Amino acid sequence: MATMIPGEIITPEGDIELNVGRSTCTINVANTGDRPIQVGSHYHFYEVNAALQFDRDLAKGMRLDIPAGTAVRFEPGDEKNVNLVAYAGSREIYGFNGLVNGPLE
């Protein structure tokens, strides 16, 4: 039997698929501001910095479809497509910029 190392994560062989079966979309985002903006993996994309221009209605209830703990950075003048994934669970959003603070449906 192998010795377990504290904090060690043992994963199965092969690739790990993230967010399987959840609704996704791709949106074009432009940073119209004069400063870089970084958005974390679990931030409610609908509520990100107002200098990011995109279809906010499409982003309601969605977050970046990237691994937990990572982020996407938008430099001033940047325009790029990002993939979003729907929040799961109770689908209640609290905090962030206070634009929802309750159930999404």
Swiss-Prot record:
A Gene Ontology biological process noted in the UniProt record is: urea catabolic process
> Could you tell me the EC number(s) of this protein?
3.5.1.5
| SUPFAM superfamilies on file | Urease, beta-subunit
Pathway given in the UniProt record: Nitrogen metabolism; urea degradation; CO(2) and NH(3) from urea (urease route): step 1/1
EC category = hydrolase
Q: Where in the cell is it found?
A: Cytoplasm
Per the record, what are the reactions this protein catalyses? urea + 2 H2O + H(+) = hydrogencarbonate + 2 NH4(+)
UniProt keyword list: Cytoplasm, Hydrolase
* Top-level taxon in the UniProt lineage: Bacteria
Q: Name one GO cellular component term.
A: urease complex
**InterPro entries assigned:** Urease_beta-like, Urease_betasu_sf, Urease_subunit
List, alphabetically, the Gene3D superfamilies matched.
Answer: Urease, beta subunit
> Residues of the signal sequence?
none
An MF annotation (GO) of this entry: urease activity
> What family does this chain come from, according to its entry?
Belongs to the urease beta subunit family.
Q: Whom does it interact with, and what assembly results?
A: Heterotrimer of UreA (gamma), UreB (beta) and UreC (alpha) subunits. Three heterotrimers associate to form the active enzyme.
Name of the featured protein: Urease subunit beta
Supply the source organism for this entry.
Answer: Synechocystis sp. (strain ATCC 27184 / PCC 6803 / Kazusa)
Gene that specifies this protein:
ureB
